[in-house]
């Protein structure tokens, strides 16, 4: 007859499984639009960036994101903005990328 796992062992296994799930979720989030500089979210104006960033839910818990900082870099295809955010509920850091490229007039 096998003994049931000790409480500490079960806790470690659960903790390991949660960390693995967080890493998998973060890896998938980097492939979403805005998750990396290679896949930025295109916007027409810089005024829209902060509102869109704050309106994005946390990838881990679905909570509201709080702006921590931003940085802009000029590229040939427009201005690339990196927005650093943190979740208000779980404090998970998140970086979103936006490309400010004004729409060309006809």
Predicted regions and their residues:
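Short linker/helix segments within small regulatory modules
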Residues: 71-82
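Cys/His-rich microdomains that often coordinate metals
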Residues: 64-65, 94
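Short, intrinsically disordered terminal segments enriched in charged and Pro/Gly residues
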Residues: 1-51, 98-106
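Short Cys/His-rich "knuckle" micro-motifs
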Residues: 68-71, 97-99
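Short cysteine-rich clusters marking metal-coordination/redox-active sites
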Residues: 58-61, 87-90
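Residues immediately within or flanking Cys/His clusters that coordinate Zn2+
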Residues: 54-55, 80, 84
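Coil-to-beta-strand transition motifs
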Residues: 78, 91-93
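Residue-level recognition of well-ordered beta-strand positions that form the cores
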Residues: 84-86, 99
């Amino acid at each position: 007859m096998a003994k049931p796992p000790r409480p500490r062992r079960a806790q470690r296994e659960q903790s390991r499984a949660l960390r693995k799930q967080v890493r998998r979720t973060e890896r998938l989030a980097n492939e979403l639009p805005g998750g990396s500089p290679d896949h930025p979210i295109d916007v027409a104006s810089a005024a829209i960036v902060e509102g869109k960033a704050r309106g994005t839910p946390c990838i881990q818990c679905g909570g509201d994101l709080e702006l921590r900082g931003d940085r802009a870099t000029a590229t040939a295809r427009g201005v690339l903005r990196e927005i650093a955010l943190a979740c208000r509920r779980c404090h998970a850091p998140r970086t979103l990328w936006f490309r400010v490229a004004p729409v060309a007039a006809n």
